[in-house]
Amino acid sequence: MLQTTWPQESVTFEDVAVYFTQNQWASLDPAQRALYGEVMLENYANVASLVAFPFPKPALISHLERGEAPWGPDPWDTEILRGISQGGESWIKNEGLVIKQEASEETELHRMPVGGLLRNVSQHFDFKRKALKQTFNLNPNLILRGGMKFYECKECGKIFRYNSKLIRHQMSHTGEKPFKCKECGKAFKSSYDCIVHEKNHIGEGPYECKECGKGLSSNTALTQHQRIHTGEKPYECKECGKAFRRSAAYLQHQRLHTGEKLYKCKECWKAFGCRSLFIVHQRIHTGEKPYQCKECGKAFTQKIASIQHQRVHTGEKPYECKVCGKAFKWYGSFVQHQKLHPVEKKPVKVLGPSLVSPQCSSPAIPPVLLQGSCSASAVAVPSLTFPHAVLIPTSGNFFMLLPTSGIPSSSAQIVRVFQGLTPTVKPSPVILTPSSHSS
């Protein structure tokens, strides 16, 4: 955005011009004169392309274009040339080259000291060419208005006073976010925003939580943090009912239902619905390992891996078995250990109505007469409860329900199932899955 007042910073052809006296011009050989003319014409073309308004052609350029000698009366005041700089260093007077240089914000004119800087004409021309490139930085966005430099965005035409402001603005068009948080990988357009965000992780922000004293970088971050203490989860998924404290986590969860994957790796084209997983995946290609152990220097791509590694040094064992009290560093080892302890076996509940042969019905279960699709009569049993039971195929389309414990063997019953099967079809034994006993 253009401001109403700007510091004056004049840039003209005179700032990059070199003048010779008649004697100086006579001392140059043809190759040096040709090089001089080439550089001056190039300087003039560069300045003319950058200035936004027309200006008179300098006499020096007119002489060079006509092939005339460019020398003439000394363009600088001879009284000034006889002066001594404030630092006590003599400036070029009659011998050597006379140069006009921009030396301060007010663009005061000074003379270039000899000081061994320019040892020959060719070296001097090369120096002036480099100085011109540094002055304008060959920036295609640079424009000059009224002798002042501005930087214009080619996308939207917005004008800025400083090139750094333009570069930051251009990120809004490209979407580039070069500054990343080392803790969570979140990216930002400016280093300031990244620094403010990182204070959330270390608890040094200006907004302090009254519950735990942690400092947050913004009022919004404080509000989200306080939900940890209150247990509030205002964002609820309409699909499954799961609730979340943060809207970002809620939106990320929604992608599990929609199957949407916004983040695609440009290296291998693998897509992710979660930004954090996408960031971790990219480290496979870049080799980046931002989490480094302070004890041994080992680095990791994920924060959780770094936390687990710390237990090697601290000896922490957070996973404790409730049966025997043994503790483990790793969750995987804890799960494997749990398998060593016998799991409490719950009684099996066989849900009815089951078709049972009336000849073998148990006296403990009152039979109820049903009309089946088969010609033989059958008895419906509302439920049969056994600690364990196995269905064993027998001849024909009958199965034996054999309890393994808890009921005398005399209570074995013949169960009619799959009445449409032929006698040759004998399914394999089926073990019933245990379920909780209903009252």
UniProtKB/Swiss-Prot annotation:
UniProtKB keywords: DNA-binding, Metal-binding, Nucleus, Repeat, Transcription, Transcription regulation, Zinc, Zinc-finger
Role this protein plays: May be involved in transcriptional regulation.
Principal location: nucleus
UniProt record similarity statement: Belongs to the krueppel C2H2-type zinc-finger protein family.
Protein name listed in UniProt: Zinc finger protein 621
Organism the protein comes from: Homo sapiens
PANTHER family xrefs: ZINC FINGER PROTEIN, ZINC FINGER PROTEIN 383-RELATED
SUPFAM superfamilies: beta-beta-alpha zinc fingers, KRAB domain (Kruppel-associated box)
Organism lineage string: Eukaryota, Metazoa, Chordata, Craniata, Vertebrata
Encoding gene per record: ZNF621
GO biological-process terms attached to the record: regulation of transcription by RNA polymerase II
GO molecular function per UniProt: DNA-binding transcription factor activity, RNA polymerase II-specific; RNA polymerase II cis-regulatory region sequence-specific DNA binding; zinc ion binding
Localization: Nucleus
Pfam families registered for this protein in UniProt: KRAB, zf-C2H2
Superkingdom of the organism of origin: Eukaryota
Domain KRAB: 11-83
Record bears the keyword Zinc: yes
GO cellular component, one term: nucleus
InterPro entries xref list: KRAB, KRAB_dom_sf, Znf_C2H2_sf, Znf_C2H2_type
Zinc finger (C2H2-type): 151-173, 179-201, 207-229, 235-257, 263-285, 291-313, 319-341
